Amino acid sequence: MARIKVHELRDKSKSDLSTQLKELKAELASLRVAKVTGGAPNKLSKIKVVRKSIAQVLTVSSQKQKSALREAYKNKKLLPLDLRPKKTRAIRRRLTKHQASLKTEREKKKDMYFPIRKYAIKV
């Protein structure tokens, strides 16, 4: 089997990807048998190509699955952990902008009764 182009894989459906994956795994198994029995050198060099093709199919299928999940959870309040943006632990625990901007009653009164003085300079 020749190398697979990823842009062609992205157009395929989930069932097509799974059938292609089964075919590639079967081919890899036969190539490994040929390796043990002392097969031709061109078959041995083909193992790397087939393994890479399997990885590409698995990657595309997982990407499709993740994008479908993103669509499903698009307007929901809570997201699964693996769909949330990856940030540092400290950033994830930081206060939100709204929480940081909140003021206590005392602060509000102080700001109201003692506003910042504004001066105009005559020219």
Curated annotation (Swiss-Prot):
GO terms for biological process: maturation of LSU-rRNA from tricistronic rRNA transcript (SSU-rRNA, 5.8S rRNA, LSU-rRNA); translation. GO terms for cellular component: cytosolic large ribosomal subunit. PROSITE patterns: RIBOSOMAL_L29. The keyword Lipid metabolism does not apply. GO terms for molecular function: structural constituent of ribosome. Pfam families: Ribosomal_L29. Keywords: Ribonucleoprotein, Ribosomal protein. Belongs to the universal ribosomal protein uL29 family. HAMAP family: Ribosomal_uL29. This is Large ribosomal subunit protein uL29x. It comes from Arabidopsis thaliana.
